[in-house]
Amino acid sequence: MKGSSESSSRGLNNTSGVSEFCTDGSKSLSHIDYVRSLLGSHKEANLGGLDDDSIVRALECEDVSLRQWLDNPDRSVDAFECFHVFRQIVEIVNAAHSQGIVVHNVRPSCFVMSSFNNVSFIESASCSDSGSDEDATTKSREIGSSRQEEILSERRSKQQEEVKKQPFPMKQILAMEMSWYTSHEEDNGSLCNCASDIYRLGVLLFELFCPVSSREEKSRTMSSLRHRVLPPQILLNWPKEASFCLWLLHPEPSCRPSMSELLQSEFINEPRENLEEREAAMELRDRIEEQELLLEFLFLIQQRKQEAADKLQDTISLLSSDIDQVVKRQLVLQQKGRDVRSFLASRKRIRQGAETTAAEEENDDNSIDEESKLDDTLESTLLESSRLMRNLKKLESVYFATRYRQIKAATAAEKPLARYYSALSCNGRSSEKSSMSQPSKDPINDSRQGGWIDPFLEGLCKYLSFSKLRVKADLKQGDLLNSSNLVCAIGFDRDGEFFATAGVNKKIKIFECESIIKDGRDIHYPVVELASRSKLSGICWNSYIKSQVASSNFEGVVQVWDVARNQLVTEMKEHEKRVWSIDYSSADPTLLASGSDDGSVKLWSINQGVSIGTIKTKANICCVQFPSETGRSLAFGSADHKVYYYDLRNPKLPLCTMIGHHKTVSYVRFVDSSTLVSSSTDNTLKLWDLSMSISGINETPLHSFMGHTNVKNFVGLSVSDGYIATGSETNEVFVYHKAFPMPVLSYKFKTIDPVSELEVDDASQFISSVCWRGQSSTLVAANSTGNIKILEMV
């Protein structure tokens, strides 16, 4: 409705002769000439500071027609708002009259209102004598601007199209508006004059203060207005306005006020003063609101900075407390060192019979050795300092995470104690007894008394203990007649004496580790070689029976071998698809677990040769592992990006589900009884604390290890004494420590071109398997070409 009334008020043609303006000199001006002279008079009178572009801006903006605004059924009368609108139109008419021009078109359809209630007079087709394209073109040329001409032409053509679409009642209202705003003398055939404009101002004033809800009522009210009959509500609610309106609507032109009398009247000036006061108050209120907004902004910034300052102060306090604890420990250790030295010195003084010459020679030799050791120590210290500074930010984040986690745990432990002592107090127990039984130290303070130092210091020392991975031996064991020598799995026996490899060449090869290290040759032959019918995916040694090895293959078969006898012991074929992983229980060496692409985990008894339990899931199982301390629980990783931890006594539901990876979980390994690490093809390893699960869900890993590349292949995972080894698709081996998320060491396999014998970068090669030699610093790694290296952290 709004759109239709607006377009109609701007687009309806009429024939009432409203495009010419009669003056006392009987001169006539086109409507555009009038507008331009009106704008000029506004400039002179400082009534708006308008220019020719103001019309263009008025036409470009979708302002609300004054007719549309008046006919809005939801409009309520705001006296100041109505006076503000009326005064603006009076000033426009006065500007025209001061130049001897009769406006004639003082009608709501010829004015538009902005969102700020600023009124503008527009040249509308509804205010034009002719709707022809020729007249429109002539008028648009008079603007004198090609931009204005183009906008006006497009506007008129659009309005003419919209007029055709307008419903008949809207056209009727605009036609009726013409009759409402026609003065008595014009009805009698007289020419319009300035008094006629005064009459039209009276009609407009009446419309401003008399809103009507329906068109029928509007028509009746305006017909009565022709006879100066006003509705009772306007006489009751707005008596002063009604009286002034009747003066402007006097049937005799000579009895109407002139424009100067109108401007000097108390009716115009008093509301203007009130309006100015109101505008000043509104401006003051706006400025106050702006200041409040600025103040709120500053308070918000201050609050955030204060929170940051408080947090920084807490951090500094925590650091100061920790520094004090470390200094105290250092003083205690130094005192112990002095005691040991004094004890050794007293024993040395007993040896009085030693020869002086021999002692001097020995001292010379010792001094040389000490200088050498000092150089090595200095070099090691500089290296450690360099690595410390290079990873300072990450070490810092781990330190604070460790401390806050410990404080949080201490706070949680304090709450039940506080409730307990509160209950004792409520039960009437003596405060003396309570104070005697209550611990003297706050758990939070206890957590700050050095409980964090040993674990963090141990991790830091282990992180800085080694500087590189050194190659101890190279092993080329690939078959010349086999096109693929990818090693899928490596495993050491219980004593770390032998290691086995298994891969797509369908063979299990057993090597003696020490003989390979001592022998400088590149090519080594296995001490035992076992042949399988299918490609092998996994291998595992029995921790109790030294010669027993289990393997899994691509056909879904689990096999148990006797290495000493070089024969197959048993074969289990219950899986329907490829088996990716197998693992023996260290606590129960007769128990074996396997995970398959068929979505199941099977538990096997090697004595019975059949499965004794099955855990069925909805996704492929890529890895399984028992914790070393018990055979009653099992962890496995799945293609659904999750890690599951089961109590095998209740295999229906997982004890804990670890959620955090974004792609397939390819490996899981236990670091200790309550911590495990998982590897995924999302380029990360994640360390999980099994005790941190809430309602069986753990979504917060202790660390996410990043540095290696792993997006599509299985690259291996092995754990030893807190060190975590994994492969990378960059043909590198990475070693992490459980305490920190960044790599400790890395080593890249070199690829030598057999023709040029030069080192080349082969992007297709990747590390396919890694395995620690027990709890030592020795690591065996193999890549996708079958190249095996024995590495050592030094």
Swiss-Prot record:
InterPro entries: G-protein_beta_WD-40_rep, Kinase-like_dom_sf, Prot_kinase_dom, SPA1/2/3/4, WD40/YVTN_repeat-like_dom_sf, WD40_repeat_CS, WD40_repeat_dom_sf, WD40_rpt
Record keyword Transmembrane helix present: no
The WD repeat ranges on this chain: 482-521, 531-571, 574-614, 616-656, 660-698, 707-746, 762-794
Segments passing through the bilayer: none
Chief place where the protein resides: nucleus
Entry keyword set: Coiled coil, Nucleotide-binding, Nucleus, Phytochrome signaling pathway, Repeat, Transferase, Ubl conjugation pathway, WD repeat
Summary of the knockout phenotype: Reduced hypocotyl elongation in blue light.
Domain Protein kinase span(s) in chain numbering: 1-268
Annotated localization: Nucleus
Amino acid composition bias (Acidic residues), ranges on this chain: 358-369
Residue ranges, annotated region (Disordered): 126-165, 352-373, 428-447
Chain location of the short sequence motif DWD box per the record: 635-649
GO cellular component, one term: Cul4-RING E3 ubiquitin ligase complex
GO biological process terms held by the UniProt record: photomorphogenesis; red, far-red light phototransduction; response to blue light
Alphabetized GO MF terms: ATP binding; identical protein binding; protein kinase activity
PROSITE patterns hit by this protein: PROTEIN_KINASE_DOM (PS50011), WD_REPEATS_1 (PS00678), WD_REPEATS_2 (PS50082), WD_REPEATS_REGION (PS50294)
Highest rank taxon of the organism: Eukaryota
Feature: compositional bias, Basic and acidic residues: 136-165
Coiled coil ranges: 272-326
Subunit organization: Interacts with COP1 and CO. Binds to CRY1 in response to blue light, this interaction prevents SPA1/COP1 complex formation and thus avoid COP1-dependent degradation of the transcription factor HY5 by the proteasome and promotes hypocotyl elongation.
Record text about domains: The protein kinase domain is predicted to be catalytically inactive. The DWD box is required for interaction with DDB1A.
Protein function: Repressor of photomorphogenesis in the light. Probably part of the COP1/SPA E3 ubiquitin-protein ligase complex.
Protein name, entry field: Protein SPA1-RELATED 4
Organism for this UniProt entry: Arabidopsis thaliana
